[in-house]
Amino acid sequence: MAGIVVVGSQWGDEGKGKIVDLLCQTADVVVRYQGGDNAGHTVYHQNEKFELSSLPVAIINPNHLAVIGNGEVVNPKALLLEMKMLKERGLDISGLRISDRAHVIMPYHIALDALCEQASGGRIGTTKKGIGPTYADKINRRGIRMVDLVDPKSFAEVLKEFLPEKNNEITKLYGGQAFDFQTIYDEYVEYGRQLEKYVTDTTVLLDKLSQEGKRIIFEGAQGIMLDIDHGTYPYVTSSNPVGGGAAVGSGTGPNKINQVVGVVKAYTSRVGEGPFPTELKNEIGDKIRETGHEYGVITKRPRRIGWLDAVALRHSVLVAGITQLSINSLDVLSGFKEIKIATAYKVDGRTLDHFPANLRILENAVPVYETIPGWSEDISEVQRRQDLPVNAQNYLNRIEDLLKTPILAFAVGPHAEQTHLLKDPWSEDKEVLHTI
């Protein structure tokens, strides 16, 4: 078996779905290993645009298995609506498999997410999808799993045990409205009935596929800088998008992973609150936002924009074990006379070349920029690295130098045919720095 993990190397929205869709052409299985329906993926298939949040990107290809791993949290209502949408658009979703160990987002999780966010004054900026409260219940051993949802008797038992606790929290702590047991039970038992045929022990399934020599892609959600352990805590998600999260969130041993592809936007974007050292609060940021259509797939919120941050990216390469890079949105930078890359931070007279954990330091960090000449040419139809304008080639070369990691692919537009591989992604040879 060969396994490739695809991770977002920044604060999410790097275009992971596009590279996963491209890699799918030579793979057999795609596994989502963390996150939930708070993370949107936009892919184009046969000139159609698909916006997915719950399902792995591979679901749009009938020749692949699309697996929701144990590390993902599942909103059954949202999942079924997404499945219905794909069916109505003529897609075959019979390749879907859902881990029986995946945890279920319940209506009280969504309510608690909104109430907590309101109480904090929107400090974290969650999507209010119930992701955080679901992961919290998982850690507190108060969660409901898919294996419970598809068994009406088991579901009744766990719901009867946990619902009073949640209602107490909602009403007494936040002054919210309590949930009725029978209403939730009737609704969610029906969801379980509809999803039952897709639910299985995906750990056993993936092991079987591995022994058969199948190629497996592990698809991360969000980005490494939002990782619960390694991101800009507390302005983070509730799971581990890092490469190591793929093994935990899929039930697959780390020895089954051969490569970790870090997807990098050619600049930086972020949604919500939190430190952002290279943020551009000026006309340059506005131009990049509009040219790159930088609005959230799920939230529709305008994304914050900044120059490429090599300090943050070095941190991502380190903690995620990134072996190769995929550079997206290179075309968005066409037309700029100069492009900047942050290579270090200045804080209180000191120079930092690593990404600090201390939020106060991050919030006061002043980027040390390296300026690179830009290019004016339209590159949206370029297919080979050597055919890019010289300055665009130099920009890619400098990214490789700063991160000490080779580029596997680059994209010059949003469509699959505008993403170009520089080598066989399944090859063990990683020495492609500046050679293509």
Curated annotation (Swiss-Prot):
It is an enzyme of class 6 (ligase). PROSITE patterns: ADENYLOSUCCIN_SYN_1 (PS01266), ADENYLOSUCCIN_SYN_2 (PS00513). SMART domains: Adenylsucc_synt. Its cofactor is Mg(2+). Coiled coil: none annotated. Keywords: Cytoplasm, GTP-binding, Ligase, Magnesium, Metal-binding, Nucleotide-binding, Purine biosynthesis. IMP binds at residues 13-16, 38-41, 127, 141, 222, 237, 301. This is Adenylosuccinate synthetase. It comes from Oenococcus oeni (strain ATCC BAA-331 / PSU-1). The gene is purA.
